[in-house]
Amino acid sequence: MPRIPALVPLAPWERTAQLALFMLVMLAAWRGAWLQHAHDPYEFLRHGNDSLGYYQWLPATFIHFDWSRMFWCHQMENGNWISLFTLGVAVLQLPFFLVGHAAAFTFGYDLNGFSAPYGVAMMLGGACYTAAGCVVSFRLARRFSAGLPALIAAALLFVATNVYFYAVREPMMSHNYALFLIGLHAYCSLRVLDGPRGAHVLLLVLSGALIVLVRQLNVFSLLFPLLVAGSKDRVRLFFSNILSKHASLISGLALGMLPWALQMIYWHWTTGEAITFTYGKKGEGFEWDKMVPGLVVLGVRNGWLVYTPLMIAVMTMLIRRAWQGIAPARTVLLLTCITWLLYSAWWSWHLGSGYGHRGFIDLYALLAVPLAWLIQAVMSRGLIWRMTAAITVIALVQLNMGLIERYDWFWSWEDWTWKRLFEQVSDVVIGK
């Protein structure tokens, strides 16, 4: 059975670095989003795409008091309109929406949920959850590696992957929120196995409920604690430790079920069903006979490893550690493969109008562990290895930032080709 390393408390410098990581990522993401959308913050929230689908619950609930007046819905055969998007992201955005509402009231802006104060507050919210996701990635990686490699891994997730795109250009999308939730759930799972405080149990249950409410496909990430436990005795210990904190368990269940109850009330009101697969109402779903796993990771249309090549090395390290039986490599690899195969069967396997197959972002807190292993391995090598790795990382960050700056929505369309992508890469390399 792969052994989970014992919990080692953070050193003082690591606690300081953790706070610095949060502040730097939060400020960089907030400033980047503000610069990206400052020309029209009103349109930033109104733009008709998935972002509006997640956000629309807040103005519909707190301003219009009417769920039938949401703005990005699909009309069903019975004539009713339904939001394809659940309210999980809106629950996480709520504190920042209230800040924006208070600012709009104080400074005389329109109290409509879409004026500039709401937009700036939502940018701040996205930045905070991205930063929190980097912090939980650090804490997870730190459990299985030294502090410095874990810190570098968390920072690289922000600057060298498509996390940056969804922090700056599309901060209202669900993926960075899901990254934080899955990372928090995995971290709390390990703490519950250690012998938890009440807060760990409460956050474990609450984050699990929100993970599924934000993106239902991520339900498989809830297998993490059962898989990483590694034996029946450890699984029994996991549940025993949860039940030992019954007050926290009840509180977590109550908080987690409240938004689910609201969601089911809405579904029943508009469809007559308490549990609804909303995309099915639009004729969208999984096509198991048309799976394209190769295109999901290597296709020119949003192929994960094409647009986030750092993950080639990360997956190589993950597979190696899984072969060696080092925890939690097999668990992380299994969850990554499940996600990969599910997206390969989705009717829109490339998740159009995205950058670098955004579906994998949700798992990046888990993938911070093999990334930290990779960094630790390089740091143990000689000077030439370390210099080569540093130059490679700088090049990957430059490539990531350059492609994000040049990105346009048609990159995921059918007429997007390798030739056109290489032209963009060439422009990044020569600084055009």
Label the predicted regions.
Residues L7-A11, P196-G198, D233-L253, T316-L334, ...:
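Membrane-interface helix-loop-helix junctions at transmembrane boundaries of multi-pass membrane enzymes
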Residues L58, A154-A155, H200-R215, L222-L227, ...:
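Membrane-interface alpha helices of multi-pass inner-membrane proteins
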Residues V136, L156, Y177-G208, P225, ...:
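Specific aromatic-rich, kink-prone transmembrane helix
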Residues M1-H39, M122, A132, R142, ...:
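Start-transfer (signal-anchor) and selected internal transmembrane alpha helices
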Residues F224, V228-R234, H246-R320, V332-Y343, ...:
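Membrane-lumen/periplasm interface segments of specific transmembrane helices
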Residues R3-P9, C134-S137, L305-L333, L367-A377, ...:
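Hydrophobic, aromatic-rich transmembrane alpha-helices
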Residues Q18-L21, F105-G113, A132-T161, F180, ...:
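Transmembrane-helix signature of polytopic, membrane-embedded enzymes
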Residues L111-C134, L151-L184, C188, A209-N218:
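Aromatic- and kink-enriched transmembrane "portal" helix at the membrane-lumen/periplasm boundary
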